[in-house]
Amino acid sequence: YPQDAADTATLLRHADLAMYAAKQAGKGRYRRYAHSMQAALLDRIALERDLERAIAGGELRLHYQPLVDLATGRIVSAEALVRWPHPTRGMVPPAEFIPIAERSGLVVALGRWALDEACRQAAAWSHARAPGAPRVGVGVNVSGWQIQH
């Protein structure tokens, strides 16, 4: 106790951080408070704020992974993949920002943006295709939250 906090309020905040870290580690786990937990929390809060700004400010990008028909060599569809080139952190991996979006509720705005952007791109590809060429479908993975909202 004495090394973890100087007063009761701080001790309780630190205990909460340790409890959430234990929950994140899985059922039946425990964690002792470590100063790195506070830094990790502040980093997640900053990343959430930055993600909200990125969605509103057009910082996100969609990359497309093609699905190719091996028999013909033609692209039959493409999967839209959200990428985030953060201005100071560099490329933030989806495994890092998608859970934050889900926990914060930003996943609905993120999904809406991805659907709108993928539809715009699909329309552009459709207008640019050669006469008689087959259309290319576009797939977008969305969260269950997106469907409910």
Model-derived features: where do they sit?
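Short beta-strand edge/capping elements of PAS-family sensory modules
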Residues: 9-10, 28, 76-79, 93, ...
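Catalytic core regions of nucleotide second-messenger enzymes
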Residues: 4-7, 23, 90, 126-136
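Catalytic-site/binding-pocket detector for metal-dependent nucleotidyl cyclases
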Residues: 105-106
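Helix C-cap/alpha-to-beta connector motif
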Residues: 113-142
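Residues at or immediately flanking beta-strands
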Residues: 29, 59-61, 135-139
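Cyclic nucleotide signaling catalytic output domains
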Residues: 1-25, 31-46, 50, 96, ...
